[in-house]
Amino acid sequence: MVLLARADRSLLNDAVTVLAACLMTLVVAAAGTHGGTRSPPDLPGLTWLPGADRARPWLLTALLLAYFAGTVLYVKTMIRDRGDGRRYALSVAYHVVVCLPAAVVNPWLGLLFVALALRSAVVPKWWPGITPAAIGAGEIAASITLGALLLLT
């Protein structure tokens, strides 16, 4: 079907994939606590969401989602949608918005997210021809930094 051509590269497809991957944090948290689920007090006998009784897995999931959703926007701005002013503005705006919540959780996370916001604003303008390999290397470095900070959070 023509409408679905290249749908595997759509923003919606990427967002759903990122959401599913980030939700695995909750699955792992539940598995690491022998199920980690319990019934809500007002609904005895029903299994609740993994980690529903603990805030940390949800916090980690939210932070991972914030980072990887921004990555989708940034990479699309740099490769598939290079030169698209609306996609660029969306990417920069998104990155700026997530800085404050990240900083509230941990100032070091806030600093990382500020650096990512600056990157989303500066790199597409100053280095529009940067190679996909260089973009990927930057994402690897940012992911490792995020992972280290999340372990300390």
Would you name each region that the model predicts?
Residues 1-19, 78-92, 121-141:
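Interhelical loop and helix-boundary elements at the membrane-water interface
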Residues 1-2, 21-24, 64-73, 114-125:
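Alpha-helical transmembrane segments and their membrane-interface exit regions
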Residues 7, 50-54, 67:
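Alpha-helix N-cap/loop-to-helix boundary motif
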Residues 14, 61-64, 110-113, 140-143:
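Residues within membrane-spanning alpha-helices of integral membrane proteins
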Residues 16-30, 87-102, 137-153:
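Small-residue-rich segments of transmembrane alpha-helices in multi-pass membrane proteins
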Residues 23-59, 100-109, 148-153:
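Helix-coil boundary and interhelical linker segments in multi-pass alpha-helical membrane proteins
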Residues 63-101:
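Active-site rim beta-loop-alpha module in soluble metabolic enzymes
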Residues 90-125:
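Transmembrane helix-loop-helix
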